């Protein structure tokens, strides 16, 4: 794993849909850690007026745009999950642009270390921007239950998302640290605090 001279020591935080990545990331933010969310970067690169949005509209048609010119994410999601080749085309377009946004935001970090939160940390190659990987892990059935409750989508859509992401086993193979998030929020907070102190100690020994 490599690091740009202009970016801080960076922890990659990942996990499947419904694993609790966002909740864990918020606890790190509360502790003063600079966190960049790859999903946010993915939204920034397709804002109206950005070249990527124009290319997407040309490729998929105007049906992927809302009346106000914003990207219709639901329409696009349906298209790319139905046709894997379309998902690969979109990833080839967006992944380099998202990486540029991430590096730009990491360079502004002032905390002792930074965190890159990404559901596709392994699949997208974003792990190359990190020095250590923390996986938020939960049993798949709990992932499905949480996502159905949170997102108001069908179980078929949840299964399609799971299939598009790295498998639980693949994520765990890449993990330096694993947090099994199958308990309550108080426990998650305490585990994040424990890991935060560990990373501060670890970072203290890094150049």
From Swiss-Prot:
This enzyme's EC code(s): 2.7.1.24
Keyword annotations from UniProtKB, A to Z: ATP-binding, Coenzyme A biosynthesis, Cytoplasm, Kinase, Nucleotide-binding, Transferase
CDD domains tied to this protein: DPCK
Keyword Transmembrane attributed: no
Primary localization class, coarse: cytoplasm
A GO BP entry: coenzyme A biosynthetic process
Gene Ontology MF: a single term: ATP binding
Compartments, record wording: Cytoplasm
Listed Gene3D superfamilies: P-loop containing nucleotide triphosphate hydrolases
Chain sites annotated for binding ATP: 18-23
One Pfam family named in its UniProt record: CoaE
PANTHER family hit by this protein: BIFUNCTIONAL COENZYME A SYNTHASE-RELATED, DEPHOSPHO-COA KINASE-RELATED
Family stated for the protein in its record: Belongs to the CoaE family.
UniProt protein name: Dephospho-CoA kinase
Organism: Pseudomonas fluorescens (strain ATCC BAA-477 / NRRL B-23932 / Pf-5)
């Amino acid at each position: 794993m490599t690091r740009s001279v202009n970016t801080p020591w960076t922890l990659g935080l990942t996990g499947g849909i419904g694993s609790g990545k966002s909740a864990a990331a918020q606890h790190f933010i509360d502790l003063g850690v600079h966190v960049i969310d790859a999903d946010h970067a993915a939204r920034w690169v397709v804002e109206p007026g950005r070249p990527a949005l124009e290319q997407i509209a040309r490729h998929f048609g105007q049906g992927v745009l809302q009346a106000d010119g914003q990207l219709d994410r639901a329409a696009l999601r349906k298209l790319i999950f139905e046709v894997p080749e379309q998902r690969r085309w979109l990833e080839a377009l967006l992944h380099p642009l998202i990486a540029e946004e991430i590096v730009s935001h990491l360079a502004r970090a002032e905390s002792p270390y930074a965190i890159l939160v990404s559901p596709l940390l392994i699949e997208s190659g974003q792990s190359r921007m990190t020095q250590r990987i923390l996986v938020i892990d939960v049993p798949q059935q709990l992932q499905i239950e949480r996502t159905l409750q949170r997102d108001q989508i069908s179980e078929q859509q949840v299964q399609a998302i799971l299939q598009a992401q790295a498998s639980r086993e693949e994520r765990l193979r890449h993990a330096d640290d694993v947090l099994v998030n199958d308990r309550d929020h108080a426990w998650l907070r305490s585990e994040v605090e424990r890991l935060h102190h560990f990373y501060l100690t670890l970072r203290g020994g890094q150049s």
